[in-house]
A protein has these predicted regions:
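Cleavable N-terminal targeting peptides that direct proteins into the secretory/outer-membrane pathway or into
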Residues: 1-33
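Small-side-chain secondary-structure face that scaffolds active or pore-lining regions
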Residues: 265-290, 320-322, 378-382, 393-465
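Compositionally biased regions
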Residues: 17, 28-31, 257, 351, ...
Length: 465
């Protein structure tokens, strides 16, 4: 029997490929960040640990990392930094941009806010600018926060500010100009869609429709804007962009037994109010301004006796349009409540729009321009002193330290109130699809601006340790 054989020729070759890698450094060979492998971090109470030797869960963020973005305070700079740290922003208004922190999620039923320390003292993180901070250390597990007891149950955020450097001198000036956008603006229906939906809802409830077909046609055509309005209250009241300016100058250095760090910061923001300069002599813009002045001193009294002094002063002012009892007007609440078909923003004669039907909701555009403004002033002083004595002559590793701190906080309120005339025209009869008779409604009165001011909060706190 004849057998067939299949012969398959094969050619074996070797393919050589070259790969290019980045320059080798200590980070690649050792598996640790080269720059920070010998870093010592403060975990509180003058206790420090080397990162490479620590078994605690600690994450450290450095100034050169978080200070790459324009931010109101150090809290806003920590978005996306620090493993285990969750940062939530609750407001788009610059003055209220104070995020909430969680470390490793929610820890308890009562409170979930971590303990915030600034140079070892419990203080508000929003009072500190990014420029004056050296490091932010996040303590996450039980081993890391053990020295804080019950207060550290939700984790600890320890902020260390900059200090001077022996035998050096440095002057630094920075300027940031930033823009903010309303990224998630709500969309509201036009007046014709609103009127149709209102009629449908009334019919479903077995009631008479509110708008006639002639009125629906008027809303759709836009032929009578002062009688049947179609107002974009959001677009009329707010603009799309705000502007921020941050000026910072710092002085850093020292001699053989003395170190210093001094910083002055000025932050200003003009918000989203569309036309705030409609009045003589004042603006109704949503504005925020703050000045931070910090001085950190380190003095070597003797070879074993060290004195540390920190002083931070803050002046801030917040302006909001409209006047209310210790607060500005809630324009967003008005915009959400008022439909586009309610009344025109302004009448043909220049009077602000308003109606008896919507008497409970004011014209947000009128409030943002013609109802004056409210101001909040905050005055804050933080001062602390730490004296450290090395007692290693008695026994190696022995030392003693004492700390004294003083916090002073005051808040002042100014209410500048002003009223205005408002009104609207209503159609009472139609003829061949055209309004044939109208009535005029008016209310309110034009008043001069009145002012009231008082101190609404004053706090002084002393700490000894």
């Amino acid at each position: 029997m004849r057998k067939n054989r299949l012969i398959i020729p094969a050619l074996l070759t070797f393919l050589s490929m070259q790969g290019y890698a980045q320059e080798l450094n200590d980070s690649i060979t050792s598996g640790k960040p080269a720059k920070y492998s010998d870093e010592v971090v403060e975990i509180g109470y003058h206790k420090a640990q080397r990162l490479e030797e620590s078994t605690s869960s600690i994450s450290t963020v450095y100034n050169e990392d978080f200070n790459k973005r324009s931010a109101k305070n150090i809290a806003n700079s920590l978005f996306g930094y620090g493993t285990g740290l969750t940062t939530l922003q609750g407001s788009g208004r610059y003055a209220d941009a104070e995020p909430t922190f969680f470390i490793r999620g929610l820890q308890s039923l009562s409170t979930n806010n971590p303990l915030i320390l600034v140079d070892g003292i419990e203080r508000d993180i929003t009072d500190v600018t990014p420029e004056e901070v050296e490091t932010v250390t996040i303590l996450k597990d039980a081993a890391a926060v053990a020295i804080y007891g019950h207060k550290g149950i939700n984790g600890v955020v320890n902020i260390t500010t900059k200090r001077g450097i022996y035998n050096t001198r440095e002057i630094k000036f920075t300027y940031d100009h930033g823009f903010g956008w309303q990224a998630r603006k709500p969309k509201f229906v036009d007046s014709y869609s609103y009127a149709n939906a209102m009629n449908e809802a009334l019919v479903n409830d077995g009631l008479t429709t509110r708008y006639t077909q002639d009125e629906l046609n008027a809303f759709r055509s836009g032929q009578y804007p002062y009688l049947y309005a179609n107002v974009d209250w959001l677009g009329e009241t707010y603009r799309d962009m705000d502007a921020t300016n941050i000026y910072n100058i710092s002085f850093r250095g020292g001699a053989s037994k003395f170190r210093y760090y001094a910083m002055a910061n000025l932050t200003t923001n003009k918000g989203f109010i569309a036309n705030p300069y409609m009045n003589d002599g004042y603006s109704t813009q949503d504005q925020y301004s703050r000045a931070n002045l910090r001085t950190n001193l380190d003095i070597d009294l003797t070879e074993k006796t060290k004195l540390k002094l920190n002083v931070l002063g803050i002046l801030s002012e917040t302006r909001t349009p409209g006047a209310d009892d210790q607060g500005g007007a809630n324009l967003w609440d008005m915009i959400y409540t008022l439909p586009s078909a309610a009344f025109p923003a302004r009448l043909e004669n220049g009077t602000w729009g308003g109606s008896a039907t919507w008497a409970g909701t004011k014209n947000p555009l009128a409030v943002s321009q013609a109802a004056a403004y409210t101001k909040f002033h905050e005055r804050t002083l933080f001062a602390d002193m730490t004296l450290t004595q090395d007692l290693s002559s008695i026994t190696p590793g022995l030392g003693a330290s004492g700390m004294l701190s003083y916090d002073n906080y005051a808040q002042y309120w100014e209410n500048h109130s002003k009223t205005f005339v408002y009104g609207s025209n209503s159609v009472t009869a139609w003829e061949n699809g055209v309004p044939s008779s109208t009535t005029y409604y008016t209310d309110g009165k034009e008043s001069a601006m009145s002012s009231d001011a008082k101190c609404i909060a004053f706090t002084r706190v002393f700490n000894f340790a």
